[in-house]
Amino acid sequence: MHYVLVLQWPVSSEADFDTLIAMEDTLEGAIPGEHGIVDGHDFGSGEMNIFVYTDLPLIAFRDAEAAFSDEPKWSEIRAAYRPAEGDTYSVLWPHHLKDFAVQ
């Protein structure tokens, strides 16, 4: 897969870890294999992230959006993707976000 899609949310409490795990499990069932592969998560430094390897970052993001549209945390999402062998992110959401990083 050529890209890494990162779905990122701010962390407000340790209870968010359970939410992250549940969201990751949901996402594994929501993204068809031809759209991407959920490859784990990261929690700490004030943020939580889910990583998806994909050749279709926009479509994989839409799959996530469909899966999480009723999830209260969805409104806080930041999403971006980068080449699997690169460091420069292209922001998907929110549109006004200029810089994206994984701490």
Predicted regions and their residues:
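Long, intrinsically disordered low-complexity tracts in eukaryotic nuclear proteins
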Residues: H2-W9, F100-Q103
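Surface-exposed, low-hydrophobicity interaction/linker segments
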Residues: L5-E34
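A preference for well-ordered globular domain cores
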Residues: P10-S13, G40, D55, L92-H95
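Short amphipathic alpha-helices in soluble, non-transmembrane regions
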Residues: A22-L27, R62-S69
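Short, intrinsically disordered low-complexity segments
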Residues: E34-A67
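Short, conserved secondary-structure transition motifs
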Residues: I50-V52, P83-T88
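Conserved short beta-strand edge segments in small beta-sheet-based binding/regulatory domains
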Residues: D70-G86
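Short, low-order "capping/linker" segments at domain edges
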Residues: G86-Q103
